[in-house]
Design a protein with these regions (language model features):
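Outer-membrane beta-barrel transmembrane domain signature
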Residues: 110-118, 122-167
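C-terminal structured domain segments
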Residues: 158-185
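Short connector loops/turns at beta-strand edges and beta->alpha or beta->beta junctions
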Residues: 27-29, 142, 176
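C-terminal outer-membrane beta-barrel translocator/porin domains of Gram-negative envelope proteins
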Residues: 1-128, 135
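Hydrophobic beta-strand residues in large extracellular and virion-surface proteins
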Residues: 70, 74, 121, 131-135, ...
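Outer-membrane beta-barrel initiation region
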Residues: 2-14, 127-132, 146-148, 161, ...
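Outer-membrane beta-barrel "beta-signal"
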Residues: 171-178, 193-211
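A short, acidic, flexible beta-alpha connecting loop/helix-capping segment that sits on the rim
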Residues: 185-191
């Protein structure tokens, strides 16, 4: 079940309005694990997984002056999902925090958890209908961070014991047929994780089966 509401003035690189969603999902299915390198001590496992997932997200933009807009966002997620056979499988199936287009197309274990809180702020300088400069800073805090033991099994760490952040600055040129975006961003983990990129056109992501 999902409830969505939006008054944004653009699907991407919006500067006015807000977007809000509340999603509740129930999943059930079978999980099968086959070792990649079978040994005498390894074995195939089959488990049934059932879990509840509830998420809420809202972001909004407020016009402070004709040339300056201040945006913000908040996101919360809770999932009762159990651990998978090993740490890698657990992290692959954990929910991710991906507020930027770049973060949506990359895999980063530091920004994944079964329960988390996140928030961000987005100062935007709007020069005209064509050009804008966006700066974004986000904080991500797992309620229970997922860790790995010596046997490559997942376990929960101490509550609220980890904090991650990411920041991005981008220059946007809006054209009738698409947008040109040049960006640089930084993730707190892995260390020294910097990225520079250029995108042409629109990056519009469809709804996922597991939100």
């Amino acid at each position: 079940i999902g409830f969505y509401d939006s008054t944004l003035n653009a699907r991407q690189y919006a500067t006015k309005g807000y977007f809000e969603k509340l999603v509740a999902q129930v999943f059930t299915g079978k999980e099968k694990f086959i070792p990649g390198n079978p040994t005498e001590t390894s074995f195939t496992t089959k488990d049934r997984q059932s879990w509840l997932q509830i998420s809420y997200m809202k972001y909004a933009y407020h016009t402070m002056t004709p040339k300056f807009t201040l945006g913000w966002m908040a996101e919360m997620l809770y999932s009762s999902k159990n651990f998978s056979e090993n740490y890698a499988a657990t992290m692959l199936q954990a929910a991710d925090f991906s507020p930027t287009p770049h973060s949506k197309i990359m895999y980063n274990e530091a920004f994944r958890a079964n329960q988390f809180l996140a928030a961000g702020i987005k100062p935007i300088f709007v020069f005209n209908d064509m050009f804008q400069v966006r700066s974004e800073l986000y904080g991500f805090m797992p309620i229970f961070p997922i860790k790995k033991n010596a046997l490559n099994k997942a376990y929960y760490g101490k509550a609220f014991s980890r904090f991650e952040y990411l920041g991005e600055i981008s220059v946007i040129c809006q054209l009738p047929f698409g947008a040109i975006s040049a960006y640089v961003n930084h993730y707190s983990s892995p260390k020294k994780e910097w990225n520079v990129g250029l995108t042409l056109g629109w990056q519009l992501f469809n709804y996922r089966f597991i939100e």
